From Swiss-Prot:
The keyword Cell membrane is annotated on this UniProt entry: no
Residues that coordinate or bind Zn(2+) 1: H78, D139, D196
Active site feature: D80, E173 (proton acceptor)
Subcellular location: Cytoplasm
Catalysed reactions, semicolon-separated: Release of the N-terminal residue from a tripeptide
Cofactor stoichiometry and binding remark: Binds 2 Zn(2+) ions per subunit.
Names of the cofactor(s): Zn(2+)
Protein name as catalogued: Peptidase T
Any one Gene Ontology BP term: proteolysis
Summary of the function given for this chain in its UniProt record: Cleaves the N-terminal amino acid of tripeptides.
Keywords: Aminopeptidase, Cytoplasm, Hydrolase, Metal-binding, Metalloprotease, Protease, Zinc
Organism: Shewanella pealeana (strain ATCC 700345 / ANG-SQ1)
Broad class of enzyme this protein falls into: hydrolase
Length: 407
């Protein structure tokens, strides 16, 4: 299984599948569709049933049940890699029997346990790293490799009891659109798991409540030589507004269950400037208070302006899946038991972000998140442990077995 996973993963990361938040096409990049076509051919060759690729880039397939009266479950991963860092020409390095020392990434970069202490737990194991010029793509091609490997194992080992199992590989998860065209009804699962987490044992069923606030400053432009008493610089209005935001209520000062405001972007000219904030909190009441506080701050700032104006538009992005998952405790219990059966200690912690599962849970498909075995996603220091990928694959198989007992 280990060698098969390694080869499968190395094949997948050769596809550049970065998504593009500026492109409104679905998927946002054609390369994701090319990768999905490759996976479709692989699934057909492996004798998966009902293999379908939609024109939106959603790839689904089925492992038929071999026992009756068992809930249908699903496993989900995403095709795209983050637009944050280059995903072109990925040249993975395979480090066998890691010795605990610095790993040279190509010519100019280093992956060091002094900076990334998580490396220390993988001495003697096989790591896959970047060459320092791109991200690796473990997020989420490790998840794809693990799902296909696990479900193919079930197909070729009919002595393992399981119900109907569905898989889906989605486009554009990294830009928040992975669930936009997901057909929950046709997927036909009672619950599912995204395979999109990090270190071994991660089991996540809480995520941020999330919103985006667009604040627009309106000014008045004229020739700077005749600007006295006439010019109103929208950029100055925007900058002074941001100076009123709390300095410590930001991502770099928050952790665990802390929420935050994050200035994601600012741009403008004299006539018009925009500030884009993301708002995050795990607690729904505090989340609503954050949105209200920001709206009231804009109103107060406008009242103090003699000229110029700010407007605000707040849009919710996704909500904490906890409210949709906890009413179905067996979904979590089965995943925990599967890990424990394999000698894995479950690590239950909140996702300081979102997944396809957070939106799918509110679309009627409760969907916690499980580990892939990767670290340092979205950058040149990303790496994956192959032995951890094996454990993720075994966890998927064990979940299928335990679900067959849950009648």
């Amino acid at each position: 299984m280990k060698q098969q996973l390694l080869e499968r993963f190395l094949s997948y990361v050769s596809f550049d599948t970065q998504s593009d938040g500026q492109n409104q096409n679905v998927p946002s990049t054609h390369s994701q569709f090319v990768f999905a076509q490759h996976l479709r051919q692989e699934l057909v060759s492996l004798a998966f049933e009902d293999v379908q690729l939609s024109d939106k880039g959603y790839l689904t397939a089925t492992v038929p049940a071999n026992v009756e009266g068992v809930p249908s479950i699903g496993f989900i991963a995403h095709l795209d890699t983050a637009p944050d860092y280059s995903g072109k020409n990925v040249s993975p390095q395979v480090i066998e029997n890691y010795n605990g020392e610095d790993i040279q990434l190509g010519l100019a970069e280093v992956l060091s346990p002094k900076q990334f202490s998580s490396l220390n737990q993988y001495i003697g194991q096989t790591l896959i790293t970047t060459d320092g010029t791109s991200l690796l793509g473990g997020d989420d091609k490790a998840g794809i490799a693990e799902i296909i490997s696990a479900l193919h194992h079930l197909l070729t080992h009919p002595e393992i009891p399981h119900g109907k199992i569905r898989l889906c590989f989605t486009p554009d998860e990294e830009i928040g659109r992975g669930a936009d065209h997901f057909d929950v009804e046709s997927f036909g699962a009672q619950w599912a798991y995204t395979i999109d987490g990090g270190q071994v044992g991660e089991l996540e069923y809480e995520n941020f409540n999330a919103a985006t606030a667009m604040i627009t400053a309106t000014g008045n432009n004229c020739h700077p030589g005749t600007a006295y008493g006439v010019m109103v610089n929208a950029q100055t209005i925007a900058a002074r507004f941001h100076a009123k935001m709390p300095l410590k209520d930001t991502p770099e000062h928050s952790r665990d269950y802390d929420g935050f405001f994050h200035l994601l972007g600012m741009e403008g000219v004299t006539e018009k400037a925009t500030l884009t904030y993301i708002i995050r909190d795990f607690d729904l009441e505090l989340f609503e208070k954050r949105k209200q506080w920001l709206t009231e701050l804009v109103e107060k700032y406008n009242a103090d302006l003699s000229i110029g104006q700010l407007t605000i538009d707040v849009q919710d992005s996704y909500l904490n899946m906890k409210q949709q998952v906890l009413p179905h405790p067996h979904i979590i219990d089965i995943a925990k038991q599967a890990m424990q059966n394999l000698g894995i200690e479950p690590i239950i912690k909140p996702i300081r972000g979102g997944t396809d599962g957070s939106r799918l849970s509110y679309m009627g498909l409760p969907c916690p998140n499980l580990f892939t075995g990767g670290h340092n996603f979205h950058g040149k220091h990303e790496y994956v442990c192959v032995e951890s990928m094996v454990k993720a694959t075994e966890t998927i198989i064990e979940i299928a077995k335990l679900t067959a007992e849950h009648k």
